[in-house]
Structure formats: structure tokens, C-alpha cells
Amino acid sequence: MSEIKDVIVQGLWKNNSALVQLLGMCPLLAVTSTATNALGLGLATTLVLTLTNLTISALRRWTPAEIRIPIYVMIIASVVSAVQMLINAYAFGLYQSLGIFIPLIVTNCIVVGRAEAFAAKKGPALSALDGFSIGMGATGAMFVLGSMREIIGNGTLFDGADGLLGDWAKVLRVEIFHTDSPFLLAMLPPGAFIGLGLMLAVKYLIDEKMKKRRAEAVAAELPSGETGNV
């Protein structure tokens, strides 16, 4: 149980692929102009990570070490192709919006990295959980960044959600404030870099605060004569 909890915490926070490892920067910065686009690509990446980790882990005993990377890439490409066709069939608006960034999931360092670092060494169930956790961690970061940029740039939230979730999702669109022209700095790549930098700073502050609280808790449990050694 502790190993399962550790996998989840690592994927969502401690080893977050977007905020700690800083992997997948190209789609993170390019696609997160709206919350809907960010959520769509994040969920697609999560599905790819989960399925590829599961498949690679299940086949790890029969995968020759010398050619494992080409095999991993072939498996990842197959899963990405299937996910791309699913998005094309059921969320065509999102498919058009994301464009080339869906097939580019094949080259995403997050996917190949988890296959090599985790799925090739652990069982299928734990590997699938790792892929899901890493994917949801990246999705969360992309969604927060996309929401920030959409609100500041357009004054809306969940604009175009019907392209991802269907016609019913039109009710999710919220106009926070009206603007006749978008704030381009937030919508263009420089705004993505600024937003990501702010998110990294906030995560650092939270981590430092949590670390300080843990140190204070340990110091409180020790005898008074030993606190100076903590």
C-alpha cells in the first residue's frame, strides 16, 4: 500500500513531469492557450502513458535489452495512432485544434522516460498506475496554465468545451470579463513561459513550507536536549 501511495504522490506532485522534470515543454507551452485544449491534450497523454506502461510492462520479459528502445517507440506509436483516431472520431473540433501535437506525443520524453525508468522494471498494475499518475500530474499542470492564460487573455474559461465533451458542455463556458480584443501576451508563447515560471515559484514555496513543517514536527518530537542537532 505504501508503494502505491508513493507512486501516486510522485506522479502528481513530487516528481511532476511538467513542474519538476520539465519534460514535454513543447506541447505544454504551445497547446495551453485555453483550458479545453490543455485538458484535451493532457487526457490524451494520460491515456497513452497508461496503456504504453501497461503494455511495455506486460512484455518486459520478452523484450531484448539490445533493441528495447525501438520496441518501446513502436508500441508508443501504435497507442498514439489509436488515440488520435479516437479523438478524430469523437472530438473532431479538439482534433483540429490540437493538430500536430497529438502525433507528437510519440516523441514526448515523458512517455519514453516512464517506459524505460519504470514500466520495464515493475509489474503491469503498478506500471499502469504510474502512467496514470504521471499523466494526471501533467494534465493538472497544463490545465492550470491553460486556465490562467485563457482567463487573462480572453476573459473566458472552458471556451470550446463542446469540442471536447460534446454539445452539452457549452453550458460550461464562463465569461469572467468582456474584452473586445484578446491580451496577446497571455495567448502567445511568452505568456506561457511567464505563467509556467509563476507556477514553478508557487510549487517551490509550497514545498519549502511543507519541508519546514515536517522539520518542526520532528523537532517537537525529540527531547529538548537533542533539538539542536536537527
From Swiss-Prot:
Entry EC no(s): 7.-.-.-
Record Pfam families: Rnf-Nqr
Compartments in which it is found: Cell inner membrane
Membrane topology value: Multi-pass membrane protein
Subunit structure: The complex is composed of six subunits: RnfA, RnfB, RnfC, RnfD, RnfE and RnfG.
PANTHER family recorded: ELECTRON TRANSPORT COMPLEX PROTEIN RNFE, ION-TRANSLOCATING OXIDOREDUCTASE COMPLEX SUBUNIT E
Family membership noted in the UniProt record: Belongs to the NqrDE/RnfAE family.
Protein name (Swiss-Prot/TrEMBL): Ion-translocating oxidoreductase complex subunit E
Organism (species): Citrobacter koseri (strain ATCC BAA-895 / CDC 4225-83 / SGSC4696)
